[in-house]
Amino acid sequence: MKHIRNFSIIAHIDHGKSTLSDRIIQICGGLSEREMAAQVLDSMDLERERGITIKAQSVTLDYHAKDGQTYQLNFIDTPGHVDFSYEVSRSLAACEGALLVVDAGQGVEAQTLANCYTAMEMNLEVVPVLNKIDLPAADPERVAEEIEDIVGIDATDAVRCSAKTGVGVPDILERLVRDIPPPQGDPDGPLQALIIDSWFDNYLGVVSLIRIKNGSLRKGDKVKVMSTGQSYNADRLGIFTPKRVDRDVLSCGEVGWLVCAIKDILGAPVGDTLTLARNPAEKSLPGFKKVKPQVYAGLFPISSDDYEAFRDALGKLSLNDASLFYEPESSTALGFGFRCGFLGLLHMEIIQERLEREYDLELITTAPTVVYEVITTAQETVYVDSPSKLPALNNIEELREPIAECHMLLPQEYLGNVITLCIEKRGMQTNMVYHGNQVALTYEIPMAEVVLDFFDRLKSTSRGYASLDYNFKRFQTSDMVRVDVLINNERVDALALITHRDNAQYRGRDLVEKMKELIPRQQFDIAIQAAIGNHIIARSTVKQLRKNVLAKCYGGDVSRKKKLLQKQKDGKKRMKQVGNVELPQEAFLAILHVGKDSK
């Protein structure tokens, strides 16, 4: 056991985690030269296209150190994006140490801090690494000072490397072996294995990634899932060298995969503990804290025949992504679908794209909303995650919206622009600290504003230099209203949105104008209105198409023309009474972009 090292790499987006992991795999000979590809561990197409890591991946490598010993390195690659911070905390729970990778040109960013604090809370040994020293803009001295100043780790002897060229990577491995402690645990005690991650394989059933904390697991053992009490046979187990390799035994301290032919998706929940059926452990391991989704949206299949397939797909995805929440919902406009909860907008996009790609579904998404806390006049507390669930106005005593605490790190010259943006988003400044040329800003901003487009706007006002980390702080009373959209005097539930009263007029008008462009013209006038309760705040009309019925009349009596025009008018009137308006998919997406272009 003293030759095992479990570690993960934490860093901000684009600071070179995945490239560094490629080099480590190459040096340890995990894959032959022919199989080596850039970003080996980003195995999803989506990850490669967007250049981001979404899922944590694990690899077991053998490293021949300079002291003549061979060490087993279990290494878990983690995502850097704020929406996937849950993946990071799960990966860290399986490790004893972490490499903190910082770009020597960009310096410390908000995400680096957030993930680093997570690691420190779990008492992991953090080893700082300065990456990208081959860049002309690199300034390792300044960045080393920044790490000490902002993060509070001694970085004077931080390893300097360039993951792209491979300079300094062997030093990192030596440092790992030296500084990161070997796993603790009792190899002879009863088995306790933590499920770090699981995914669904069409041939094998549920595959789980596990970390053995105590005891050992052999092929053919009967294992018991502690939370459900179900027992399964350990059919196959082994390690990743990124490829799956079968082994007969996983011993204490190792990280590996396990297949028990579990067909039920909820059979082995992430964060659960496995133990042996014949000699069970007394108590389960402390799992992970459950994360609460911050953003909710309705997802509906375009054709109702896909509903079953959609439900199965969501089940399989939620197994792989424990932070996804879903429950069935029906809408008068869109039929049956699911209300899904996500950690952020990027998370929502990724899930939607994965559903469309991996499961061939066509989906409509409603506008994302956050969770509001409503105190009714009967003094009950209700949590509302969709505008259609909001009680009637006269039953609401007060409406509280979630407030997010946002930590931003940015260069001084962009401070003015960013503060202006925060004020526009109804933010309250709580703290501001200068670190050299960097400023650390803390604001309390309503979650609804953060979720909508705050991250994109922050990046564009600061030319990409500002970085953001946010978490839910509390609910706070606020003057929020529900804006309904009426089309031909009928409310469309899927188009409703909850917004602050100050912005309601503006957002209502904007939405109505956008709808007018998107709804195709019909044979009759279509009135589009935005309303708060019964009070109409904006209206526009999609003009009817009309045929020129007088084309065949030449001169002659005017009463003939009047008769034809009157006949047309009556026809239109009758049509309007029975006519339905088909809403295109773009109309639902328009809500997402309300208020983006005009500001």
UniProtKB/Swiss-Prot annotation:
Keywords: Cell inner membrane, Cell membrane, GTP-binding, Hydrolase, Membrane, Nucleotide-binding, Protein biosynthesis
Location of the protein in the cell: Cell inner membrane
Main enzyme class: hydrolase
Family annotation (PROSITE patterns): G_TR_1, G_TR_2
Domain tr-type G: 2-184
Entry's Gene Ontology BP terms: positive regulation of translation
One annotated Gene Ontology cellular component of this protein: plasma membrane
GO molecular function: GTP binding; GTPase activity; guanosine tetraphosphate binding; ribosome binding; translation elongation factor activity
Catalytic activity: GTP + H2O = GDP + phosphate + H(+)
Matching InterPro entries: EF-4 (IPR006297), EFG_III/V (IPR035647), EFG_V-like (IPR000640), EFTu-like_2 (IPR004161), G_TR_CS (IPR031157), LepA_C_sf (IPR038363), LepA_CTD (IPR013842), LepA_IV (IPR035654)
Entry EC number(s): 3.6.5.n1
Pfam family, one: GTP_EFTU
Residue sites binding GTP per the record: D14, H15, G16, K17, S18, T19, N131, K132, I133, D134
Record membrane topology: Peripheral membrane protein
Family: Belongs to the TRAFAC class translation factor GTPase superfamily. Classic translation factor GTPase family. LepA subfamily.
Record-linked NCBIfam families: lepA (TIGR01393), small_GTP (TIGR00231)
Function (record text): Required for accurate and efficient protein synthesis under certain stress conditions. May act as a fidelity factor of the translation reaction, by catalyzing a one-codon backward translocation of tRNAs on improperly translocated ribosomes. Back-translocation proceeds from a post-translocation (POST) complex to a pre-translocation (PRE) complex, thus giving elongation factor G a second chance to translocate the tRNAs correctly. Binds to ribosomes in a GTP-dependent manner.
Name listed for the protein in its UniProt record: Elongation factor 4
Lineage: Bacteria, Pseudomonadati, Pseudomonadota, Gammaproteobacteria, Enterobacterales
Gene: lepA
